[in-house]
Amino acid sequence: MDKREEKTREAIVEAYLALSMEKRGSKITISEVASRANIARKTFYLHYESLEDVSQDASRRKLDDLILILERHRFFKNPFDTDLLFHCLNQLIEPDIDLYRYLSKENPELFFWSQLKRTMIRLITEIYKSQIDMPAPELRLYAEYFISGVTAVYISWLREEIPLPFEKLASLVGEATLHGIRKPQSGDSAETSA
């Protein structure tokens, strides 16, 4: 794909996301997206077959951005680092937090989150399969449990169902990942057992 085609696709995606925020639940048409992207309707069809295709492309683009952020922060050296995953997610989402809040309230499975879960589970499983002595189905279960839990909590926070500051949320999810529901007591540290 040449730069001009990529620029047109990017304009279509941006127009689609902007209209999603503005219209909040009202039907968006291809004509509206084309007009907002400053292209002809027939140009839209040169790049996408439907608005669903645009939504999936937008999700893929955001996921690609997240993977770059995760790589930059070396997340894949320790892919079960909840705190780092939360901070990387937030780095991606913060600039467009109103859009993500809206989309997470409407139908979180339609945009980004389901692709995120599938991709992260696949990546974690691939990365760890040669590093951990664990049968592949068990490793996949751990990855699914971890990623599904993190994304569910993050979506609930975006929906403002969990009224905690971001840093506290990230910290608590990290504790839950390490200790489960049995939060360690202050006297249960390694220092007191020595």
Where are these regions (language model features)?
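Short, basic, alpha-helical segments at the C-terminal edge of helix-turn-helix-like DNA-binding modules
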Residues: 29-30, 58-67
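Hydrophobic alpha-helical connector segments
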Residues: 70-98
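Amphipathic alpha-helical packing segments from all-alpha helical-bundle domains
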Residues: 107-132, 137-148, 182
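Residues that mark the N-terminal boundary/hinge immediately upstream of a DNA-recognition element
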Residues: 29-30, 50, 165
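Short hydrophobic/aromatic patch on the recognition helix
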Residues: 38-48, 150
